[in-house]
Swiss-Prot record:
TM helices/strands, residue ranges: 1-21, 49-69, 101-121, 126-146, 160-180, 203-223, 232-252, 266-286
The protein, known as: Undecaprenyl-diphosphatase
Membrane topology: Multi-pass membrane protein
Assigned protein family: Belongs to the UppP family.
One Pfam family it belongs to: BacA
Major localization class: membrane
Classification of source organism: Bacteria, Pseudomonadati, Pseudomonadota, Gammaproteobacteria, Chromatiales
Additional facts recorded: Bacitracin is thought to be involved in the inhibition of peptidoglycan synthesis by sequestering undecaprenyl diphosphate, thereby reducing the pool of lipid carrier available.
Gene: uppP
InterPro entries: UppP
Gene Ontology CC terms: plasma membrane
GO MF annotation: an example: undecaprenyl-diphosphatase activity
Organism: Alkalilimnicola ehrlichii (strain ATCC BAA-1101 / DSM 17681 / MLHE-1)
Protein backbone atom coordinates (compact mmCIF):
# COMPACT_ATOMS: atom_id res chain seq x y z
CA UNK A 1 0.00 0.00 0.00
CA UNK A 2 1.36 3.42 -0.97
CA UNK A 3 2.06 5.73 1.95
CA UNK A 4 -0.19 8.48 0.63
CA UNK A 5 -3.09 6.02 0.40
CA UNK A 6 -2.40 4.87 3.97
CA UNK A 7 -2.39 8.51 5.09
CA UNK A 8 -5.63 9.25 3.23
CA UNK A 9 -7.41 6.25 4.73
CA UNK A 10 -6.08 7.26 8.15
CA UNK A 11 -7.55 10.73 7.67
CA UNK A 12 -10.93 9.27 6.68
CA UNK A 13 -10.91 6.93 9.68
CA UNK A 14 -9.86 9.68 12.08
CA UNK A 15 -12.49 12.13 10.87
CA UNK A 16 -15.51 9.94 10.41
CA UNK A 17 -14.98 7.64 13.37
CA UNK A 18 -16.16 10.50 15.56
CA UNK A 19 -18.06 13.02 13.43
CA UNK A 20 -21.78 12.16 13.47
CA UNK A 21 -21.83 11.29 9.77
CA UNK A 22 -21.48 7.85 8.23
CA UNK A 23 -17.94 6.45 8.14
CA UNK A 24 -19.10 3.60 5.87
CA UNK A 25 -20.35 5.94 3.15
CA UNK A 26 -17.14 7.96 3.24
CA UNK A 27 -14.88 4.91 3.12
CA UNK A 28 -16.85 3.63 0.12
CA UNK A 29 -16.57 7.04 -1.56
CA UNK A 30 -12.83 7.14 -0.90
CA UNK A 31 -12.29 3.63 -2.26
CA UNK A 32 -14.39 4.49 -5.33
CA UNK A 33 -12.33 7.62 -5.95
CA UNK A 34 -9.06 5.68 -5.61
CA UNK A 35 -10.27 2.99 -8.01
CA UNK A 36 -11.40 5.67 -10.48
CA UNK A 37 -7.86 7.11 -10.34
CA UNK A 38 -6.51 3.75 -11.39
CA UNK A 39 -5.12 2.84 -7.98
CA UNK A 40 -5.04 -0.83 -7.04
CA UNK A 41 -6.62 -1.61 -3.68
CA UNK A 42 -6.82 -5.03 -2.03
CA UNK A 43 -10.39 -6.30 -1.50
CA UNK A 44 -11.97 -5.13 1.80
CA UNK A 45 -12.13 -8.74 3.01
CA UNK A 46 -8.41 -9.37 2.34
CA UNK A 47 -5.98 -9.89 5.23
CA UNK A 48 -4.10 -6.74 4.23
CA UNK A 49 -7.12 -4.44 4.49
CA UNK A 50 -8.38 -6.12 7.67
CA UNK A 51 -4.95 -5.65 9.29
CA UNK A 52 -4.87 -2.01 8.18
CA UNK A 53 -8.38 -1.47 9.59
CA UNK A 54 -7.23 -3.01 12.87
CA UNK A 55 -4.27 -0.62 13.13
CA UNK A 56 -6.24 2.56 12.36
CA UNK A 57 -8.92 1.49 14.84
CA UNK A 58 -6.23 1.35 17.52
CA UNK A 59 -5.18 4.82 16.38
CA UNK A 60 -8.66 6.15 17.14
CA UNK A 61 -8.46 4.54 20.58
CA UNK A 62 -5.45 6.75 21.21
CA UNK A 63 -7.57 9.76 20.18
CA UNK A 64 -10.19 8.95 22.83
CA UNK A 65 -7.52 8.38 25.48
CA UNK A 66 -5.89 11.76 24.75
CA UNK A 67 -9.09 13.83 24.62
CA UNK A 68 -10.78 12.18 27.60
CA UNK A 69 -7.67 11.51 29.67
CA UNK A 70 -8.79 13.69 32.63
CA UNK A 71 -12.18 11.96 32.74
CA UNK A 72 -10.65 8.50 32.32
CA UNK A 73 -8.17 9.21 35.12
CA UNK A 74 -10.96 10.50 37.39
CA UNK A 75 -13.09 7.46 36.57
CA UNK A 76 -10.22 5.09 37.42
CA UNK A 77 -9.42 6.81 40.73
CA UNK A 78 -13.08 6.92 41.77
CA UNK A 79 -13.55 3.28 40.78
CA UNK A 80 -10.55 2.21 42.87
CA UNK A 81 -11.60 4.38 45.80
CA UNK A 82 -15.17 3.14 45.61
CA UNK A 83 -14.03 -0.48 45.50
CA UNK A 84 -11.86 0.05 48.59
CA UNK A 85 -14.76 1.67 50.44
CA UNK A 86 -17.19 -1.04 49.33
CA UNK A 87 -14.80 -3.76 50.50
CA UNK A 88 -14.50 -1.96 53.85
CA UNK A 89 -18.28 -2.20 54.21
CA UNK A 90 -18.08 -5.93 53.62
CA UNK A 91 -19.79 -5.64 50.24
CA UNK A 92 -22.93 -4.09 51.72
CA UNK A 93 -24.78 -1.06 50.40
CA UNK A 94 -24.72 -1.79 46.68
CA UNK A 95 -22.01 -1.28 44.08
CA UNK A 96 -20.15 2.06 44.04
CA UNK A 97 -21.29 4.45 41.29
CA UNK A 98 -18.29 4.05 39.02
CA UNK A 99 -18.30 0.27 39.24
CA UNK A 100 -22.01 0.31 38.45
CA UNK A 101 -21.28 2.52 35.42
CA UNK A 102 -18.58 0.09 34.31
CA UNK A 103 -20.97 -2.86 34.34
CA UNK A 104 -23.70 -0.81 32.67
CA UNK A 105 -21.20 0.01 29.93
CA UNK A 106 -20.47 -3.69 29.52
CA UNK A 107 -24.22 -4.30 29.27
CA UNK A 108 -24.39 -1.71 26.47
CA UNK A 109 -21.58 -3.51 24.65
CA UNK A 110 -23.38 -6.83 25.14
CA UNK A 111 -26.55 -5.39 23.58
CA UNK A 112 -24.48 -4.08 20.67
CA UNK A 113 -22.75 -7.42 20.22
CA UNK A 114 -25.92 -9.51 20.29
CA UNK A 115 -27.68 -7.24 17.80
CA UNK A 116 -24.59 -6.91 15.62
CA UNK A 117 -23.80 -10.61 15.42
CA UNK A 118 -27.46 -11.40 14.75
CA UNK A 119 -28.22 -8.80 12.10
CA UNK A 120 -24.86 -7.61 10.68
CA UNK A 121 -25.10 -9.74 7.54
CA UNK A 122 -28.72 -8.65 7.02
CA UNK A 123 -27.83 -4.99 7.46
CA UNK A 124 -24.97 -5.24 4.98
CA UNK A 125 -27.09 -7.10 2.42
CA UNK A 126 -30.33 -5.14 2.67
CA UNK A 127 -28.91 -1.66 3.27
CA UNK A 128 -25.85 -1.80 0.99
CA UNK A 129 -27.57 -0.29 -2.05
CA UNK A 130 -26.89 3.39 -2.85
CA UNK A 131 -30.57 4.29 -2.41
CA UNK A 132 -30.75 2.68 1.04
CA UNK A 133 -27.54 4.43 2.10
CA UNK A 134 -29.08 7.72 0.97
CA UNK A 135 -32.12 6.90 3.12
CA UNK A 136 -30.10 6.13 6.25
CA UNK A 137 -28.01 9.27 5.73
CA UNK A 138 -31.24 11.28 5.54
CA UNK A 139 -32.40 9.67 8.78
CA UNK A 140 -29.09 10.59 10.43
CA UNK A 141 -29.59 14.22 9.43
CA UNK A 142 -33.14 14.25 10.84
CA UNK A 143 -31.97 12.79 14.16
CA UNK A 144 -29.16 15.34 14.47
CA UNK A 145 -31.52 18.22 13.67
CA UNK A 146 -34.10 16.98 16.17
CA UNK A 147 -31.44 16.56 18.87
CA UNK A 148 -30.60 20.27 18.83
CA UNK A 149 -34.27 21.12 19.42
CA UNK A 150 -34.57 19.00 22.56
CA UNK A 151 -35.15 20.78 25.84
CA UNK A 152 -32.19 20.72 28.25
CA UNK A 153 -31.66 17.23 29.60
CA UNK A 154 -31.44 16.65 33.36
CA UNK A 155 -30.33 13.04 33.83
CA UNK A 156 -26.83 12.71 35.32
CA UNK A 157 -24.51 9.75 35.77
CA UNK A 158 -26.58 8.39 38.65
CA UNK A 159 -29.59 8.27 36.35
CA UNK A 160 -27.98 5.75 34.00
CA UNK A 161 -29.72 2.42 34.53
CA UNK A 162 -30.18 -0.85 32.63
CA UNK A 163 -32.86 0.65 30.41
CA UNK A 164 -30.69 3.63 29.41
CA UNK A 165 -27.63 1.41 28.88
CA UNK A 166 -29.67 -1.03 26.80
CA UNK A 167 -31.15 1.69 24.58
CA UNK A 168 -27.72 3.18 23.89
CA UNK A 169 -26.20 -0.25 23.25
CA UNK A 170 -28.95 -1.18 20.79
CA UNK A 171 -28.58 2.19 19.06
CA UNK A 172 -24.89 1.44 18.61
CA UNK A 173 -25.79 -1.95 17.15
CA UNK A 174 -28.17 -0.41 14.61
CA UNK A 175 -25.31 1.87 13.53
CA UNK A 176 -23.92 -1.17 11.68
CA UNK A 177 -26.38 -0.24 8.94
CA UNK A 178 -24.44 1.40 6.08
CA UNK A 179 -25.16 5.13 6.19
CA UNK A 180 -25.68 5.36 9.95
CA UNK A 181 -23.04 6.80 12.28
CA UNK A 182 -22.03 5.13 15.56
CA UNK A 183 -21.34 8.42 17.33
CA UNK A 184 -24.56 9.99 16.02
CA UNK A 185 -26.73 7.06 17.08
CA UNK A 186 -25.24 6.72 20.57
CA UNK A 187 -25.23 10.46 21.31
CA UNK A 188 -28.73 11.03 19.93
CA UNK A 189 -30.31 8.15 21.84
CA UNK A 190 -28.38 9.02 25.00
CA UNK A 191 -29.95 12.47 24.79
CA UNK A 192 -33.37 10.96 24.09
CA UNK A 193 -33.11 9.00 27.35
CA UNK A 194 -32.62 12.30 29.18
CA UNK A 195 -28.84 12.35 29.69
CA UNK A 196 -27.22 15.77 29.86
CA UNK A 197 -25.10 16.63 26.84
CA UNK A 198 -21.82 16.22 28.69
CA UNK A 199 -22.69 12.75 29.97
CA UNK A 200 -24.18 11.73 26.62
CA UNK A 201 -20.85 12.57 24.97
CA UNK A 202 -18.71 10.89 27.63
CA UNK A 203 -20.82 7.73 27.77
CA UNK A 204 -20.87 7.51 23.96
CA UNK A 205 -17.12 7.83 23.56
CA UNK A 206 -16.25 5.76 26.64
CA UNK A 207 -18.49 3.08 25.14
CA UNK A 208 -16.39 3.29 21.98
CA UNK A 209 -13.35 2.00 23.90
CA UNK A 210 -14.57 -1.58 24.62
CA UNK A 211 -16.48 -1.58 21.32
CA UNK A 212 -13.35 -0.76 19.31
CA UNK A 213 -11.36 -3.26 21.38
CA UNK A 214 -13.91 -5.98 20.59
CA UNK A 215 -13.91 -5.07 16.89
CA UNK A 216 -10.10 -5.06 16.89
CA UNK A 217 -10.03 -8.51 18.50
CA UNK A 218 -12.39 -9.86 15.82
CA UNK A 219 -10.21 -8.30 13.12
CA UNK A 220 -7.08 -9.85 14.68
CA UNK A 221 -8.73 -13.28 14.70
CA UNK A 222 -9.69 -12.84 11.04
CA UNK A 223 -6.14 -11.80 10.09
CA UNK A 224 -4.78 -14.86 11.92
CA UNK A 225 -7.30 -17.07 10.10
CA UNK A 226 -6.37 -15.66 6.70
CA UNK A 227 -2.64 -15.57 7.41
CA UNK A 228 -0.48 -12.49 7.97
CA UNK A 229 -0.25 -10.66 4.63
CA UNK A 230 3.13 -10.27 2.96
CA UNK A 231 2.11 -7.22 0.96
CA UNK A 232 1.43 -4.84 3.84
CA UNK A 233 4.37 -2.68 4.87
CA UNK A 234 5.18 -1.54 8.39
CA UNK A 235 5.58 2.04 7.17
CA UNK A 236 2.05 2.08 5.73
CA UNK A 237 0.63 0.72 8.98
CA UNK A 238 2.59 3.27 11.01
CA UNK A 239 1.43 6.17 8.82
CA UNK A 240 -2.20 5.04 9.02
CA UNK A 241 -1.99 4.67 12.81
CA UNK A 242 -0.39 8.08 13.46
CA UNK A 243 -2.63 9.98 11.03
CA UNK A 244 -5.82 8.33 12.37
CA UNK A 245 -4.81 9.20 15.95
CA UNK A 246 -3.95 12.86 15.24
CA UNK A 247 -6.95 13.54 13.00
CA UNK A 248 -9.18 11.67 15.45
CA UNK A 249 -8.19 14.04 18.27
CA UNK A 250 -9.19 17.04 16.15
CA UNK A 251 -12.51 15.58 14.98
CA UNK A 252 -13.42 14.38 18.49
CA UNK A 253 -12.85 17.85 19.94
CA UNK A 254 -14.94 19.31 17.11
CA UNK A 255 -17.88 16.99 17.86
CA UNK A 256 -17.75 17.87 21.57
CA UNK A 257 -17.67 21.59 20.74
CA UNK A 258 -20.83 21.39 18.60
CA UNK A 259 -22.62 18.95 20.93
CA UNK A 260 -22.19 21.09 24.04
CA UNK A 261 -23.54 24.11 22.15
CA UNK A 262 -26.51 22.21 20.63
CA UNK A 263 -25.25 22.75 17.10
CA UNK A 264 -25.14 19.23 15.72
CA UNK A 265 -27.56 20.35 13.02
CA UNK A 266 -24.60 21.77 11.08
CA UNK A 267 -23.82 18.15 10.22
CA UNK A 268 -27.43 17.61 9.10
CA UNK A 269 -26.94 19.85 6.07
CA UNK A 270 -23.83 17.91 5.11
CA UNK A 271 -25.38 14.43 5.32
CA UNK A 272 -28.52 15.62 3.52
CA UNK A 273 -26.41 17.01 0.68
CA UNK A 274 -24.48 13.74 0.56
CA UNK A 275 -27.73 11.73 0.56
CA UNK A 276 -29.14 13.86 -2.25
CA UNK A 277 -25.99 13.38 -4.31
CA UNK A 278 -26.14 9.60 -3.84
CA UNK A 279 -29.90 9.36 -4.49
CA UNK A 280 -29.68 11.38 -7.72
CA UNK A 281 -26.61 9.56 -8.98
CA UNK A 282 -24.35 12.61 -8.84
CA UNK A 283 -22.27 10.60 -6.38
CA UNK A 284 -21.96 7.07 -7.73
CA UNK A 285 -21.44 4.41 -5.08
CA UNK A 286 -22.40 1.45 -7.25
CA UNK A 287 -18.90 0.40 -8.43
CA UNK A 288 -17.46 0.48 -4.92
CA UNK A 289 -20.43 -1.40 -3.49
CA UNK A 290 -20.04 -4.08 -6.14
Amino acid sequence: MALWIAALLGVIQGIFMFLPVSSTAHMVLTEHWLIARGETLPPPESAEMILFALVVHVGTLVSIAVVFWPSLWRFSLNALGGAWEWAGRGGRGGLPLYWRLFWLGMFSVLCTGVLGLTLKATFEHVFASPLMIAGTLTLTGILLWWTDRLAPRRRGLKGINLKVAGVIGLAQGFALMPGLSRSAMTIVFALFTGLKRRWAAEYSFFLAIPTICAATLLQAIEVYRLGLPNTVGFSALAVGFVVAAIVGIISLKLVIYFLYRARLKVFSFYVWALALGIATGLIDLAPALG
